[in-house]
Structures are given as structure tokens and as C-alpha cells.
Amino acid sequence: MLDIQLLRKDLDGVAKRLADRGYPLDVAAFSALEAERRAIQTRTEELQARRNSLSKQIGAMKGRGEDTSAVMAEVGGIGDEMKASAVKLDEIQARLSELMLEMPNVPHESVPVGRDETENVEVRRWGAPRQFDFDVKDHVDVGTPLGLDFETGAKLSGARFTVLRGPIARLHRALAQFMLDTHTQQHGYSETYTPYIVNPDVLYGTGQLPKFAEDMFRVEKGGAENTVTQYLISTSEISLTNTVRDSIVEASALPIKLTAHSPCFRSEAGSYGRDTRGMIRQHQFDKVEMVQIVAPEASYAALDEMVGHAEAILQKLELPYRVVALCTGDMGFSAAKTFDLEVWLPAQNTYREISSCSNTESFQARRMQARFRNAQGKPELVHTLNGSGLAVGRTLVAVLENYQNADGSVTVPVALRPYMGGVERIDAPSSAA
């Protein structure tokens, strides 16, 4: 959530910056509500002052033995008007809050202005795409003989679900464990296990609600009269970040660096017809997430660090990738600045997103009331960051395509072999011993 003081001081400036990311801020509606709020507050202050004055007058009159009934009646009328004003003020505050919950974060000044992903800016590349001396297959054709089972996934759960069997399942597990070990042993993150089902207020905290309810899977528990609605997490960013909601941490505890491996559940509303083949876009997929909670002055250094942590995974796996700065029109709702990592997929002859690292500044913290005690001992909002480290399924796709061999086998990346019991190659059934 944006700082309401920023909106009050520079409404037109905020509107312009939000327009850069395609959000039309209703300046007239906000201004009208603010004007009404100020008028009610001013009137309430006048009534309070008048009531205080009359209360003193009543005391003096009683001391002189005078009749106070008329003044008492006026005080009663003031009280009734103040109660009505309080109700009206609550209504206006609720409407302001509703309006502000719909507003995305203001882009950082360094974010390139653009309409959509076509105007993102490439920052750097790492690794050269492998030159194959045979016809490259996509991950579906490579993986199906090795244990990718889309047919059974569809039979069990419908489209965009996959069953992994045998060596493919083991490789998938190895990737997740390798990522967690790298982040905890080399990058300073604390491994965390959190629930996969969360309450709605948690999703308000990180910005998925109210705007993106259609992207979430809802779950309900209880009888018809006592139904409680909860949601499956679309990323463990949600649960990890909310571990500091409604709290004040000491400055000495910062930065807090958390990582988790979890399934993620997304309805993929609005993605009909996109990436229908294979594992690129699934309703359920695994991801290793990185979250940092930091002091405000440290957040952009932390963003660069987090991007480096995601890059380290790809480099250890020797997968070519590029880093892209997202433009204003392509950033997520809560982000002030985002870098995407895109891995090379030879079958598509292009780079595809495998990680997104964002600094939300105080946007999520304000919604969660997540604070730290600053040098002056006063509570101050933290900054929160999140990043994929990495999407496990898409990393599996990249390994299958980049490490495929002409005979249908897949070479296991050196970094993963300790997690595969020393196995160096996954063989297709036709060449298995």
C-alpha cells in the first residue's frame, strides 16, 4: 500500500508515475474523498472545542447555582452530531482504504518506462548457448520417455498438471535440494517451512488480494453455516514475508533472509492458450523462494545481491541466461523494481523467465505493519524483497533441453550429481542397461 501522506502531498506526481505502469489513478475520486474527510475532521474539531468550552461553562454556572439545562441540551446535540460525523468519517476512511488497496506500487526512478515485456531492457548475458550437431527436441519429447507423464496428470487433475516418475522425479527433487543447500550454505538464508494454505489477510499483506483473487485457488472448510475461505499459496513469498506481519523487530536482527521450497498453485487466469504444451505454465509447480526483510537504506543493495544469488544457481548448473530489467508496464503489482532472469531454451530458440527478483520497498510492509526499531528507537517500516531461486519445474525443463543427447539420454549437470547418487546420465529406456 502506498503512503497516504505521499498521495496527499503529490497526488498528480503519483498519478503520473502510476500511469507509466498502466494504472489510471482516479485523481478526482481520491481528491473528493480527501476533501470530504478534511471537512468532517475540521467540523469535528470545531464541535470538540465548542463542547469543551460549554463543559467549562456548565461547571461555572453550577458553581453560581444557575440553570444549565439549555447549555446541557446544546452539549447533547453536539454529542449526537459528533457521533454521526464519526460514522461518516469511518465510511470515508473505508472507501479511501478500498481505493488505495487497488493502487500498485510506484516504480523506482531507475525503472525503464515501457508498456509491456517488449520494452524490457537486457542488462547482461552469461554463457553461450550450446551448438547441437543433431535436431534438438523440446522438453516434452526429451522427458516423456524418461518419466514425464502429462496424460496421467491430466487424468488426475485436468490440463496443466504433470506426473513425474523415476529418474525425472529424482532429478526434480535433486534440483530443489541443490537450490536450498546453495542458498542456506553459501548465501546466508535460513530454510523455512510454512503452510501452503493461508488466510485472506495474509494475501492482502503481500498484495495478491483484493486485485488478483481470480489467480488464486480457494479452499473452504466447515459446514454451510460456518464456511471459512482460505487460499492455496501461489508462491511461498506470501507465507515467508508475512512471518513479520504485525511485528516490530530490532534493527540488529536485520537483514532477515528466508528461503523455502514449496509447491505453488496458480489458476493462470488470463493465460488461456499460452504455453499449453509441457511444463512451462502449470497450475501446480515447485519453486525455491528467497525473501529478505531489510532496513530501507539497504534494500537496493539487497536486490542486487538477490539477483546474484539466483544467477549463482544457473551458473553452477552451467545454463546460459540473461538478466532483464522490467519496464514499468511489465512489473508485478507490489514491485518498485524487478529484474527477471531468463534461461536459454534451445528448442524454443529463445530465453524464458526462470526467476523474478523484486524490491517492494515499504509497499508490502505498510499493508502488513511490519516494522523495525530504528536508531532513534522509533518503529519504522521495513523493506521487503522476494525472488525465485529458482522455479524448479522450469529449471528441469532447461536441464532436459540443454543437456539432451542424440541417443535420447540426458547428461546430469555436474552440480547435481552428488544429489543423484553419482549418476552422470539419465538414459532413455532403449539404451538403459
Swiss-Prot record:
It holds the Pfam family tRNA-synt_2b. Pathway: Aminoacyl-tRNA biosynthesis; selenocysteinyl-tRNA(Sec) biosynthesis; L-seryl-tRNA(Sec) from L-serine and tRNA(Sec): step 1/1. Its EC number is 6.1.1.11. It comes from the Bacteria. The keyword Aminoacyl-tRNA synthetase applies. It catalyses: tRNA(Ser) + L-serine + ATP = L-seryl-tRNA(Ser) + AMP + diphosphate + H(+); tRNA(Sec) + L-serine + ATP = L-seryl-tRNA(Sec) + AMP + diphosphate + H(+). Belongs to the class-II aminoacyl-tRNA synthetase family. Type-1 seryl-tRNA synthetase subfamily. Homodimer. The tRNA molecule binds across the dimer. HAMAP family: Ser_tRNA_synth_type1 (MF_00176). Consists of two distinct domains, a catalytic core and a N-terminal extension that is involved in tRNA binding. This is Serine--tRNA ligase. It comes from Burkholderia mallei (strain ATCC 23344). The gene is serS.
